[in-house]
Curated annotation (Swiss-Prot):
InterPro entries: AMP-bd_C, AMP-bd_C_sf, AMP-binding_CS, AMP-dep_synth/lig_dom, ANL_N_sf
Keywords assigned: ATP-binding, Ligase, Magnesium, Nucleotide-binding, Peroxisome
SBD2, as annotated region: 347-411
UniProt cross-references to SUPFAM superfamilies, sorted A to Z: Acetyl-CoA synthetase-like (SSF56801)
GO CC, one annotated term: peroxisome
Annotated organism of origin: Arabidopsis thaliana
E.C. code: 6.2.1.12
Taxon lineage: Eukaryota, Viridiplantae, Streptophyta, Embryophyta, Tracheophyta
Binding-site residues, (E)-4-coumaroyl-AMP: 252, 324, 346-347, 351, 449, 453
Binding positions (ATP): 207-211, 215, 346-347, 351, 432, 447, 538
Subcellular localization(s) per the UniProt record: Peroxisome
Identification of the protein by name: 4-coumarate--CoA ligase-like 3
Gene responsible for this protein: 4CLL3
Record-level Gene Ontology MF annotations: 4-coumarate-CoA ligase activity; ATP binding; CoA-ligase activity
Residues that bind CoA: 273, 455-456
Length: 552
C-alpha cells in the first residue's frame, strides 16, 4: 500500500487517513508510464505478448492472432490517415454488433490521436442522429444492415463485404472503404502522424442514462492507460480464455475486451449477440476459463443449472466476474452450490471511472458478503454526507466520491453536468450511497437518487430487490418509488415471475413484510414479463417509474 504524501498517517487495515478524511487503496501502487506523448494503443502494444490467439469469433471459429492483430491495426491506421484523411481530434463512430474486428478499429483510431465513440445498435435512427449531432463524427464504421440508420451523405467504412454501391443506393451514405480491404493493404511506409498527448481525448462513450439522459463521457489517453495498467496488474486476468458476453459498444465491453485483454495476453471468444445457450456452447467449444456477467445472467445460470450442466461440458470454467449491481449472499451461495468449482469475483465501477472503483481479487475477498471489494489501484475515496457535505469515516454511510488517474475529464459539450459530477479538485461524485468498513471493503447501499422517501424514512430499493429474487417463484424484480399524497412515496415492486408461476400480489407483499421493518414494506406489485435493463445489466428504473405513473 502506497500513499502520495509521506507524512500521511493511514490505518493499514482500513486504508483511512483521519487527517484528510480520505480512504486509500490497499492494492499495489499503479505504475503509469512517464512519457507525456504516449498514446494508449502504443502502451498496449508495448506489453509483453505472452499469448498466441487474441480473438475468436464464437460462431465461425475464425481466429485473430496477436501478431495478425498488430499487423492489421497498423494497416487500418495507415489507410485511415493517408486515404481517408483522419487526423488527431477527429471523431470516429463505431456502429456495429460484436465482432473480432471492433478492437482493430478501436486501436487503429486511437493510435492516430483520433477519438473513438460508439452507439447502441438497437437505437432508432432518431436516437443515433441525436448522438451524431452532438459528437459530430468524421467517419462511421458500420455494417450494410445498420447503414440505413445513419444520416445520408455521412462517410462510412463497411465492416462486412457487401456491395458498396448497393449500400449507397439503399441508405444514402457515402462508402469510403471496406474494412477487410484495409486490413489486406500493405502500409505506405510513411509513418508521419500527429503527436498525441496523454491528456488528449481518446474515447467518448455514452453513459447508460439509468436516471436521466445519456451523456458523452470524455476519456483521455491517460485515463485509458491507467485502466490498462490496472488490468495487467491483476495477475488473475492473465493468460485466460474469456467469453465476451456484453455489447462492445458499452464501456465495459470495449475497455475489457478491446484493450485490457489484449495487453494481458488473454484470448477473447466474442459472441456476436448474447444468448445463454450460445455462451455455454462457447465455454464448451473453446474451453473458456472465465465469464464476465451482469447479475441477471448469473441468476439465469443458477435457475437453469441442472439443464445447462447436463447439456454442456463446463469443466474448463473456473471464474465468473460480476458487475452492475452488488450480489446478495443468497445469490452467491446459490451459485456456489450449483457450480462449486467456479469462483465468483465482483467489480464496481462507472463509465466515468474507466473500470476503477472496487473489486474482489481473491476467493477470500469474495467471501466478504455484501461488499463489492477493495478500492482499485491508484484510487482515493471519500464518503460524504449528501445533506451536510461533511466527510465521513469508517463504517459511516454517505455519497461515494472517487479520485485518481482513471477518472474522466467530464462530459462532452455539457459543462453543467460536468460541474455537477466532478468538482474542481477532481473528485467524481458517484451518486451512490456507500460505506467502507474497518477492513477497507466498499459496500454499496443504493443509488442516492433512487432512495425511496417514505414518511421521512429512506428505503433502499436494492435491499428489497435482493429479498424478492430470493423467492423461489420470482425470476427478476425491481423496486421503484410510487407517489402517494400522505406518505410522499412508497415502495412498489415490478416482478417477473418464473414460468408456470401463479404468484399473487398479496403473496409478494406478505413475503417481504415478514422480513423488513414496517416502513420498508412493499405496498404495490405489478407483474411484468421482464425487467428493462441497460446493456450492462443495470435496471432502467426511470422506464418503470414512467410506466407506473402513466395511468395516474
Amino acid at each position: 500500500m502506497a500513499y502520495p504524501e509521506r507524512d500521511l498517517i493511514v490505518d493499514p487495515r482500513s486504508g483511512f487517513c483521519k487527517s484528510n478524511s480520505t480512504f486509500y487503496s490497499k492494492r499495489n501502487p499503479l505504475c503509469l508510464p512517464p512519457n507525456p506523448s504516449l498514446d494508449v494503443t502504443t502502451f498496449i502494444s508495448s506489453q509483453p505478448q505472452r499469448g498466441t490467439t487474441a480473438f475468436i469469433d464464437a460462431s465461425t471459429g475464425h481466429r485473430l492472432t496477436f501478431s495478425d492483430l498488430w499487423r492489421v491495426v497498423d494497416r487500418v491506421a495507415d489507410c485511415l490517415y493517408h486515404e481517408v484523411g483522419i487526423r488527431r481530434g477527429d471523431v470516429v463512430l463505431i456502429l456495429s454488433p460484436n465482432s473480432i474486428y471492433i478492437p482493430v478499429v478501436c486501436l487503429s483510431v486511437m493510435s492516430l490521436g483520433a477519438v473513438v465513440t460508439t452507439a447502441n445498435t438497437l437505437n432508432t435512427s432518431g436516437e443515433i442522429s441525436k448522438q451524431i449531432a452532438q459528437s459530430n463524427p468524421t467517419l462511421v464504421f458500420t455494417t450494410s444492415q445498420l447503414a440505413p440508420k445513419l444520416a445520408a451523405a455521412i462517410s462510412v467504412v463497411l465492416t462486412d463485404e457487401e456491395d458498396e454501391k448497393r449500400v449507397e443506393l439503399t441508405s444514402g451514405v457515402r462508402v469510403v472503404g471496406i474494412l477487410s480491404e484495409m486490413m489486406k493493404k500493405e502500409t505506405s511506409g510513411q509513418r508521419v502522424r500527429d503527436r498525441v498527448n496523454q491528456d488528449d481525448t481518446a474515447m467518448m462513450l455514452y453513459s447508460s442514462g439509468t436516471t436521466g439522459t445519456s451523456k458523452g463521457v470524455i476519456s483521455s489517453h491517460r485515463n485509458l492507460t491507467a485502466y490498462v495498467a490496472k488490468y495487467i496488474d491483476d495477475k488473475w486476468k492473465r493468460d485466460e480464455i474469456f467469453v465476451c458476453t456484453v455489447p462492445m459498444f458499452h464501456s465495459f465491453g470495449l475497455l475489457a475486451f478491446a484493450m485490457g485483454s489484449v495487453a494481458s495476453g488473454s484470448t477473447v471468444v466474442i459472441l456476436r449477440r448474447f444468448g445463454l445457450d450460445d455462451m455455454m456452447q462457447a465455454v464448451e467449444k473453446y474451453k473458456a476459463t472465465i465469464l464476465s456477467l451482469a447479475p441477471p445472467v448469473l441468476v439465469a445460470m443458477i435457475n437453469g443449472a441442472d439443464q445447462l450442466k447436463a447439456k454442456y461440458d463446463l469443466t474448463s470454467l473456473r471464474k465468473v466476474r460480476c458487475g452492475g449491481a452488488p450480489l446478495s449472499k443468497e445469490v452467491m451461495d446459490s451459485f456456489l452450490e450449483k457450480y462449486p468449482t467456479v469462483n465468483i469475483f465482483q467489480g464496481y465501477a462507472l463509465t466515468e471511472s474507466h473500470g476503477s472503483g472496487a473489486s474482489t481479487e481473491s476467493v477470500e475477498e469474495s467471501l466478504k458478503y455484501g461488499a463489492v471489494g477493495l478500492l482499485s489501484s491508484g484510487i482515493e475515496a471519500r464518503i460524504v454526507d449528501p445533506d451536510t457535505g461533511r466527510v465521513m469515516g469508517v463504517n459511516q454511510p454517505g455519497e461515494l466520491w472517487l479520485k485518481g488517474p482513471s477518472i474522466s475529464k467530464g462530459y462532452f459539450g455539457n459543462e453543467e453536468a460536468t460541474n455537477e459530477t466532478i468538482n474542481l479538485e477532481g473528485w467524481l461524485k458517484l451518486g451512490d450511497l456507500c460505506y467502507i468498513d474497518e477492513d477497507g471493503f466498499l459496500f454499496v447501499v443504493d443509488r442516492l437518487k433512487e432512495l425511496i422517501k417514505y414518511k421521512g424514512y429512506q428505503v433502499p430499493p436494492a435491499e428489497l430487490e435482493a429479498l424478492l429474487i430470493a423467492h423461489p417463484h420470482i425470476l427478476d424484480a425491481a423496486v421503484i418509488p410510487f407517489p402517494d399524497r400522505e406518505a410522499g412515496q412508497y415502495p412498489m415492486a415490478y416482478v417477473a415471475r418464473k414460468p408456470e408461476s401463479n404468484l399473487s400480489e398479496k403473496e409478494v407483499i406478505d413475503f417481504i413484510s415478514n422480513q423488513v421493518a414496517p416502513y420498508k414494506k412493499i405496498r404495490k406489485v405489478a407483474f411484468i414479463s421482464s425487467i428493462p435493463k441497460t446493456a450492462s445489466g443495470k435496471t432502467l428504473r426511470k422506464d418503470l417509474i414512467k410506466l407506473s405513473t402513466s395511468k395516474l
